[in-house]
Protein backbone atom coordinates (compact mmCIF):
# COMPACT_ATOMS: atom_id res chain seq x y z
CA UNK A 1 0.00 0.00 0.00
CA UNK A 2 1.37 3.41 -0.88
CA UNK A 3 1.14 6.70 0.96
CA UNK A 4 -1.89 8.72 -0.09
CA UNK A 5 -1.81 12.33 1.12
CA UNK A 6 -5.37 12.89 -0.15
CA UNK A 7 -6.96 10.84 2.62
CA UNK A 8 -6.62 10.08 6.30
CA UNK A 9 -5.19 6.69 7.30
CA UNK A 10 -6.92 4.44 9.81
CA UNK A 11 -5.43 1.76 12.01
CA UNK A 12 -5.70 0.05 15.38
CA UNK A 13 -3.47 -1.32 18.09
CA UNK A 14 -4.63 -4.79 19.08
CA UNK A 15 -3.95 -4.79 22.79
CA UNK A 16 -2.83 -8.26 23.84
CA UNK A 17 -5.17 -8.57 26.79
CA UNK A 18 -7.51 -11.54 27.06
CA UNK A 19 -9.50 -12.69 30.06
CA UNK A 20 -8.03 -15.56 32.02
CA UNK A 21 -10.01 -18.77 31.62
CA UNK A 22 -11.49 -18.15 28.19
CA UNK A 23 -10.88 -20.62 25.40
CA UNK A 24 -7.60 -19.49 23.79
CA UNK A 25 -8.53 -20.91 20.39
CA UNK A 26 -11.79 -18.96 20.30
CA UNK A 27 -10.10 -15.78 21.57
CA UNK A 28 -7.43 -15.97 18.86
CA UNK A 29 -10.09 -16.69 16.23
CA UNK A 30 -11.98 -13.56 17.38
CA UNK A 31 -8.82 -11.46 17.07
CA UNK A 32 -8.14 -12.83 13.59
CA UNK A 33 -11.75 -12.31 12.49
CA UNK A 34 -11.62 -8.71 13.75
CA UNK A 35 -8.50 -7.96 11.72
CA UNK A 36 -9.94 -9.66 8.63
CA UNK A 37 -13.05 -7.48 9.03
CA UNK A 38 -10.92 -4.33 9.39
CA UNK A 39 -9.09 -5.31 6.21
CA UNK A 40 -12.40 -5.62 4.34
CA UNK A 41 -13.49 -2.23 5.73
CA UNK A 42 -10.36 -0.64 4.26
CA UNK A 43 -8.33 0.01 7.41
CA UNK A 44 -4.71 0.75 6.59
CA UNK A 45 -2.81 -0.87 9.45
CA UNK A 46 -2.96 -2.97 12.58
CA UNK A 47 -0.32 -3.14 15.29
CA UNK A 48 -0.16 -6.26 17.43
CA UNK A 49 1.45 -6.12 20.84
CA UNK A 50 2.68 -8.62 23.37
CA UNK A 51 2.46 -8.47 27.14
CA UNK A 52 4.22 -10.75 29.59
CA UNK A 53 3.67 -9.15 32.98
CA UNK A 54 -0.08 -9.77 33.20
CA UNK A 55 0.33 -13.42 34.17
CA UNK A 56 -1.43 -15.29 31.36
CA UNK A 57 -1.57 -14.02 27.82
CA UNK A 58 -2.59 -15.45 24.48
CA UNK A 59 -0.22 -13.55 22.19
CA UNK A 60 3.29 -14.45 23.30
CA UNK A 61 4.83 -13.55 19.94
CA UNK A 62 3.20 -11.00 17.62
CA UNK A 63 5.32 -12.29 14.73
CA UNK A 64 3.44 -15.59 14.72
CA UNK A 65 0.09 -13.79 14.66
CA UNK A 66 1.30 -11.55 11.84
CA UNK A 67 2.43 -14.59 9.85
CA UNK A 68 -1.03 -16.15 10.18
CA UNK A 69 -2.77 -12.87 9.31
CA UNK A 70 -0.60 -12.35 6.22
CA UNK A 71 -2.35 -15.36 4.73
CA UNK A 72 -5.82 -14.14 5.72
CA UNK A 73 -5.69 -10.43 4.78
CA UNK A 74 -5.22 -8.58 1.50
CA UNK A 75 -4.18 -4.95 1.93
CA UNK A 76 -3.96 -4.04 5.62
CA UNK A 77 -0.39 -3.47 6.85
CA UNK A 78 0.64 -5.60 9.82
CA UNK A 79 3.19 -4.59 12.43
CA UNK A 80 4.38 -5.37 15.92
CA UNK A 81 3.29 -2.75 18.41
CA UNK A 82 5.73 -4.13 20.94
CA UNK A 83 8.39 -6.82 20.84
CA UNK A 84 9.79 -7.51 24.30
CA UNK A 85 13.30 -8.58 23.35
CA UNK A 86 14.29 -10.19 26.68
CA UNK A 87 11.49 -12.73 26.17
CA UNK A 88 12.74 -13.91 22.77
CA UNK A 89 15.82 -15.97 22.02
CA UNK A 90 17.93 -14.35 19.29
Residue ranges and their predicted role:
Residues 1-73, 77-80:
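N-terminal beta1-alpha1-beta2 module of alpha/beta enzyme domains
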Residues 26-29, 86-90:
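Glycine-rich anion/phosphate-binding loops
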Residues 79-87:
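Conserved strand-turn element in the central/C-terminal portion of the radical SAM core barrel
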Amino acid sequence: MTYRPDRMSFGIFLAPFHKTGQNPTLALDRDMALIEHLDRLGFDEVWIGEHHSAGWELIADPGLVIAALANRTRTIRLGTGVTSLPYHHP
